[in-house]
């Protein structure tokens, strides 16, 4: 019985692998060619547009086309109590779009001039959080009476920028001597001092742990802690 050399088996395996790679490259090229086929060569199965569905157009003597005005559902309706059309400010939340609270950055004069917005953000308890109205707009295609832009709601002046209490507490406990917790919260100046003193020889590290637990150390941008759901 003839013996098959190991080198012969390896050589056959290499040829088989090379042939497989070439086959895959050919299949990939065919697939990419089909995917980049121009739209004019493809068979379209879309529904033909009926003549009655095409918008009416006016043609001038010079050949230019002037489109006619179409019906618009965003026009303002006059409020009539017996009619089913409600005021825009009474629409449910799924039919309106509300902007984020306006940030005045501590400018009280701008708040008094505009009449709404947030002078400051943040707060750990309800009584410490400012509330404001926000500018809302009725969505396109929704019929309602009165102005389509209006002030609504009593939104809290809070924002979230990706800071988690548990994560920051772990940073403070394990890496607090290097100021990692304050770096994460945006307190760069004090973080550098904490790093150079190795957490104030342990005293600063312990104080920051207490401040985090009691709510005395918060993000520098006045944002609130993100919650896990």
UniProtKB/Swiss-Prot annotation:
Signal peptide (from-to): 1-32
Keyword Nucleotide-binding: no
Protein's name in the database: TM2 domain-containing protein 2
Subcellular location, record wording: Membrane
Primary residence: membrane
Lipid bilayer topology: Multi-pass membrane protein
Glycosylation sites per record: 34, 58, 72, 107, 130
GO cellular component, one term: membrane
Residue ranges that the UniProt entry lists as topological domain Cytoplasmic: 181-194
Topology, Extracellular side: 33-159, 216-229
Transmembrane recorded as keyword: yes
Recorded coiled-coil stretches: none
Keywords attached to this entry: Glycoprotein, Membrane, Signal, Transmembrane, Transmembrane helix
Residue span(s) of domain TM2: 162-210
Transmembrane portions of the chain: 160-180, 195-215
SS bonds (residue pairs): none
Family named by the database record: Belongs to the TM2 family.
